[in-house]
């Protein structure tokens, strides 16, 4: 086992604080409308330019192992805030640095760290309750656009694009961000249910210009197995031909004789038909077939539940107003499913989301909800260069997370004003002893840090601005973008309550742990000279020549 290097008490805390300051100082320059960019060197390709706090934090590793421990713990604050609310990472880092700095001063002055932590925790619990009381719902498109604009570094185009996307696909709709091909940002909205499976044969194409299969009022056959024998499909084909309507077959696969016969029938005009593979794999495929069945008022033909393909009747088939199939995607528009049954299915999937443990499962389940309940919107980010594209895509993703958080828990006045108001309301809080009171004061003082940093980044005097804002009431604050004072909500400077709450809670949690640290243990650096054994004795191998 490698030898360890151990530091105690003040020595440990000083080293830890040095690491905290290196990381926090690099991150906090990005805060606010006049925050600066940070350039990150990459081992390959062009450097990345970003204004995203968590992206900066993730890049920082320090040579000194004790300093690095401090930096990594604050990095955890940014990561947790990012995971919980998708934004507020810089605010969380600034709050953590302020609490740690003030807290360690109090510890150095002889205060009991455990009571300090209890005081900080009490202040944060009270502050979170006050934040919730200050919060106002964010339901209208204008407020959503304002939140998106602030989070995207005051880019109103991004804010409006996100608001439009949410308006079109609803709160439950999936909004994804992709790199576009043009210079301008674009919004692409897919109505209905779309999945990533295209036609199985180009001979199904009936819209030559678009290279797609367009089916009007089709029947939809859902099969949970491979279909290779045409005899299994004949009863369905005959029934559909009599009804003079097209047919879409969604199966695990359609191959061999079955696919060839379908192509021939389609080309001769006997029955208008197209076939696609079912989306997903394994259990997820079964679930998605069931989703399509609910959406189209059909049944999944599966031998597991005793339904055989040869005995299918028209009542087993789903229906939709229109289906469009391209080489890569299938879109079912306006399925015939009953709204109450669809909502029941959505509620069932939402319950699975709550029970899911992995982020991947949650994401896939959320996509299924969106396909059933709303739709899918794709924001295509436009930029002149690859470097700008990456930076802008980061900002758009941040803004998207912020707007989702705003819709979820409402909004408060932005620009650090909400924390100032909360601190003044909690100022009368009293702990169980004087050391807890110091902890409460540490937390309340730290709540001024975001507005001070926003002001510093704008090149103004932070103490003057902080005192002016404290003298005001309600949403009165400082707009760092214009240098004006006024009502932050009226000026459209809003922060999602969830983002502010998460930043405060995670910052206090990690800062409390660091304040109560008394010893730090790390591996001793290995002397590179002694890493390899002496190879000098190998010279004697020259005598082995006689073995030839």
UniProtKB/Swiss-Prot annotation:
Described purpose of this protein according to its UniProt entry: Together with its co-chaperonin GroES, plays an essential role in assisting protein folding. The GroEL-GroES system forms a nano-cage that allows encapsulation of the non-native substrate proteins and provides a physical environment optimized to promote and accelerate protein folding.
GO cellular component, one term: cytoplasm
Family: Belongs to the chaperonin (HSP60) family.
Alphabetical UniProt keywords: ATP-binding, Chaperone, Cytoplasm, Isomerase, Nucleotide-binding
Pfam families the record matches: Cpn60_TCP1
Enzyme class, first EC level, given as a word: isomerase
E.C. designation(s): 5.6.1.7
Protein name, per record: Chaperonin GroEL
Subunit relationships: Forms a cylinder of 14 subunits composed of two heptameric rings stacked back-to-back. Interacts with the co-chaperonin GroES.
GO molecular function: ATP binding; ATP-dependent protein folding chaperone; isomerase activity; unfolded protein binding
Reactions it catalyzes: ATP + H2O + a folded polypeptide = ADP + phosphate + an unfolded polypeptide
Localization, UniProt: Cytoplasm
Cytoplasm listed as a keyword: yes
Binding annotation for ATP: 30-33, 51, 87-91, 415, 479-481, 495
Keyword Chaperone part of the UniProt annotation: yes
Gene3D superfamilies (UniProt xref): GroEL, GroEL-like equatorial domain, TCP-1-like chaperonin intermediate domain
InterPro entries given in the database record: Chaperonin_Cpn60_CS, Cpn60/GroEL, Cpn60/GroEL/TCP-1, GroEL-like_apical_dom_sf, GROEL-like_equatorial_sf, TCP-1-like_intermed_sf
SUPFAM superfamilies attached to this UniProt entry: GroEL apical domain-like, GroEL equatorial domain-like, GroEL-intermediate domain like
